[in-house]
């Protein structure tokens, strides 16, 4: 699969290849490679690409140019507001929402595409001209206006493939003089009819005013980011940037204070206005027990942490004090409250408009707290999160950029090795054994999987598909497989740490659930642990591409019977609820420190017992509350099992109660 050069959501006008075809406009996800310009349906709620709707071979493109927008189009060429019926609402011209059209001309006529911004249009035209520059049939004249109602608005010619009416001034392609890649074509002299057309004055092409920075969203970099390819923009922690393009995808286009533009990872930034993420005292994903452990280790009077509360949308201030007479010190947790007027307080008499103002006040005044907030405490190294790919658009990875350092083990698809990308970035390299995977299907789906980005998912970086075996490149996790981690470290875990592992996995699965993406093989063996003990979910969705019948058949020796609900064992019916069942078994694995589920039974006996209603017993490290959560995942009726969102809420409640 060729690397994607550009990827954007545009409005596409129907090409009306038949005279009876309707004129309509649809949002499409456009992808450009060196070989094809393709467009797809796009699911905005799930943030993923849909079915392919069409493509154009790059070698067939003869011209790429802007189009002069039609002024005051009639109602039939206008579109309704999103979500409203056109017969019941004010019509809005298409150019008001996607005001920057351009055309891609090929052997079947012009394809009209509408961009939401002038900058995005310019970039696409530039890249398209770059990839077609060696084409042999580039035209010397084009139509600057739309083809509408059977004719071009600029010259009234009625043949869709009629020669253009305006001469291109060496703008179509970018060949240097004397290039041997294609013969230079001199334009033919105009016919008398064309000469008359050319003498007609054309309507002036509108000039787009540069985007004012006051109209753009301002963000602050949370981490440094060094560009990995030419499309990227460098980030410096604490500096401000302006967002030029924002999407559901994990890369946004931005501009720095010097006017440099490029793509940045969206998980490396936060909104500049009233954001608390940039402050040293804030730890977004820290739990109550982690905060207590860190404050005790620091042992400083007035040490404090501001963290997300277990209650959605709330914050908690955790404070350590020695002055209470307790030899080990005392930790108090204060929920940041708010009034109906959006004023924040810890003590009701002291109200503030923002949380930073609140913290600043209590850094100088205890005002009812166990101690004033003297020392912000945080993890020594707040590691930057993984990016979705090694730079924007970097999908196909060059094997020459990989250095293999050591073998990590052997998985379902082959050997896994630890290595470096370009000598500096840690990666895991899965070398796919030939015949073990449906490779073509995986490669098509992996582009979607790369856009799944969450801090508790092992990030897919890219693939190497131009040789065999193919490689899958992912985030490296230093402590390896969760199952082995549990077995090897079994005497060192406190129950609170085990619950945090469950929370980590549940957060990842809630994210996949929100994207309507199934894992299909959730188990401790398919989760990995990083150097800080954070658990991340791996191999999501890969089981669909296994070619081994012993793995894919429910009666096969390798099928994950012990993690499968009745509807999967009997009917191979996978759903988010079958992932819920598997999560309950994974919780059991964690609290049993890596034991085999149903260890006394064979696979066939296990399947029989599950069908009869047998469920796993409560591990001795699991409290009744924890066991209630895992047991709720094993309801015989799939619809009666909770969602991952509910499970996460229940786990957070237990974390607060048992800490």
Swiss-Prot record:
Question: Which SUPFAM superfamilies does the protein's record reference?
Answer: PH domain-like, Protein kinase-like (PK-like), SH2 domain, SH3-domain
Phylogenetic placement of the source organism:
Eukaryota, Metazoa, Chordata, Craniata, Vertebrata
Q: What class of enzyme is it?
A: transferase
| Sequence positions that bind Zn(2+) | 143, 154-155, 165
Name of the gene encoding the protein in the UniProt record? Btk
Phenotype upon gene inactivation: Prevents BCR-induced activation of NF-kappa-B.
List the ranges annotated as motif CAV1-binding.
581-588
Q: Describe the location of the Protein kinase domain by residue ranges.
A: 402-655
A single GO CC term, please? membrane raft
Read off the PROSITE patterns from this record: PH_DOMAIN, PROTEIN_KINASE_ATP, PROTEIN_KINASE_DOM, PROTEIN_KINASE_TYR, SH2, SH3, ZF_BTK
**Any Pfam family matching the protein:** SH2
Q: How is the cofactor bound?
A: Binds 1 zinc ion per subunit.
Which organism is this entry from?
Mus musculus
**Phosphothreonine: residues carrying this PTM:** 191
One GO BP on record is: cell maturation
Known function: Non-receptor tyrosine kinase indispensable for B lymphocyte development, differentiation and signaling. Binding of antigen to the B-cell antigen receptor (BCR) triggers signaling that ultimately leads to B-cell activation. After BCR engagement and activation at the plasma membrane, phosphorylates PLCG2 at several sites, igniting the downstream signaling pathway through calcium mobilization, followed by activation of the protein kinase C (PKC) family members. PLCG2 phosphorylation is performed in close cooperation with the adapter protein B-cell linker protein BLNK.
- Signal sequence interval, chain numbering: none
UniProt name for this protein = Tyrosine-protein kinase BTK
Subunit organization = Part of a complex composed of EEIG1, TNFRSF11A/RANK, PLCG2, GAB2, TEC and BTK; complex formation increases in the presence of TNFSF11/RANKL. Binds GTF2I through the PH domain. Interacts with SH3BP5 via the SH3 domain. Interacts with IBTK via its PH domain. Interacts with ARID3A, CAV1, FASLG, PIN1, TLR8 and TLR9. Interacts with MPL/TPOR.
The family assignment reads: Belongs to the protein kinase superfamily. Tyr protein kinase family. TEC subfamily.
Q: Which residues carry this modification: N-acetylalanine?
A: 2
The annotated consequence of residue 28 to C reads:
In XID; prevents interaction with ARID3A
E.C. code? 2.7.10.2
């Amino acid at each position: 699969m060729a690397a994607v050069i550009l990827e954007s959501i545009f409005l596409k006008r129907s090409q009306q290849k038949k005279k009876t075809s309707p004129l309509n406009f649809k949002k499409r996800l456009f992808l450009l490679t060196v070989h094809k310009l393709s467009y797809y349906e796009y699911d905005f709620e799930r943030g993923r690409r849909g079915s392919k709707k069409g493509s154009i071979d790059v070698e067939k493109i003869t011209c790429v140019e802007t189009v002069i927008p039609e002024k005051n189009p009639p109602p039939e060429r206008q579109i309704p507001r999103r979500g409203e019926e056109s017969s019941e609402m004010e019509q809005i011209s298409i150019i008001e929402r996607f005001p920057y059209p351009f055309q891609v001309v090929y052997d079947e006529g012009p394809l009209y595409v509408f961009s939401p911004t002038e900058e995005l249009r310019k970039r696409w035209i530039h890249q398209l001209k770059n990839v077609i520059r060696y084409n042999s049939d580039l035209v010397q004249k084009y139509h600057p206006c739309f083809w509408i109602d059977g004719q071009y608005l600029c010259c009234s010619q009625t043949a869709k493939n009629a020669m253009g009416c305006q001469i291109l001034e060496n703008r179509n392609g970018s060949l240097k003089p004397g290039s041997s890649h294609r013969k230079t074509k001199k334009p033919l002299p105009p016919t008398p009819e064309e000469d008359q057309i050319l003498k007609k004055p054309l309507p002036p092409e509108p000039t787009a005013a540069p985007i004012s920075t006051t109209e753009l969203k301002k963000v602050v970099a949370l981490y440094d980011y060094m560009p990995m390819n030419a499309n990227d923009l460098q980030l410096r922690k604490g500096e401000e940037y302006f967002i030029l393009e924002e999407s559901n995808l994990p890369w946004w286009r931005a501009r720095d204070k010097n006017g440099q533009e490029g793509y940045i990872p969206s998980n490396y930034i936060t909104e500049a206005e009233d954001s608390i993420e940039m402050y040293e005292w804030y730890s977004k994903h820290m739990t109550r027990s982690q905060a207590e452990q860190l404050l005790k280790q620091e042992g400083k009077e007035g040490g404090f942490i501001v963290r997300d509360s277990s209650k959605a949308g709330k914050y908690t201030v955790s404070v350590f004090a020695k002055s209470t007479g307790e030899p080990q010190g005392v930790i108090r947790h204060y929920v940041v409250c708010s009034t109906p007027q959006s004023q924040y307080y810890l003590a009701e008499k002291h109200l503030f408009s923002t949380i930073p103002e609140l913290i600043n006040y209590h850094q100088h005044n205890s005002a009812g707290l166990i101690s004033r907030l003297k020392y912000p405490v945080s993890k020594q190294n707040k590691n930057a999160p993984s990016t979705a790919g090694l730079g924007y658009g970097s999908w196909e990875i060059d094997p020459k950029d990989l250095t293999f350092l050591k073998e990590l083990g052997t998985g379902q698809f082959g050997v896994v090795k630890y290595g470096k990308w370009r000598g500096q970035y840690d990666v895991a390299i899965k070398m796919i054994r030939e015949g073990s995977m449906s490779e073509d299907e995986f490669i098509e789906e992996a582009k979607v999987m790369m856009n799944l980005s969450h801090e508790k998912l092992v990030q897919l970086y890219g693939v190497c598909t131009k040789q065999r075996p193919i490689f899958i490149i992912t985030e490296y996790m230093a402590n390896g497989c969760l199952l082995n981690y549990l077995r090897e470290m079994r005497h060192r875990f406190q129950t609170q740490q085990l619950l945090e592992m469950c929370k980590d996995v549940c957060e990842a699965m809630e994210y996949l659930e929100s994207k309507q993406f199934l894992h299909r093989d959730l188990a401790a063996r398919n989760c990995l642990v990083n150097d800080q003990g954070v658990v991340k979910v791996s191999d999501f969705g890969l089981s669909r591409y296994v070619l081994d019948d012993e793995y894919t058949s429910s009666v096969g020796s390798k099928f994950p019977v012990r993690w499968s609900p009745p509807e999967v064992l009997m009917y191979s019916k996978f759903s988010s609820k079958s992932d819920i069942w598997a999560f309950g078994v994974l919780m059991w694995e964690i609290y049993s420190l890596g034991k085999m589920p149903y260890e006394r039974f064979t696979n066939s006996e296990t399947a029989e017992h599950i069908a009869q209603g047998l469920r796993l017993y409560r591990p001795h490290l699991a409290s009744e509350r924890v066991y209630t959560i895992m047991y709720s995942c094993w309801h015989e009726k799939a619809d009666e099992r909770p969602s991952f969102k509910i499970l996460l809420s229940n786990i957070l409640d237990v974390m607060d109660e048992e800490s």
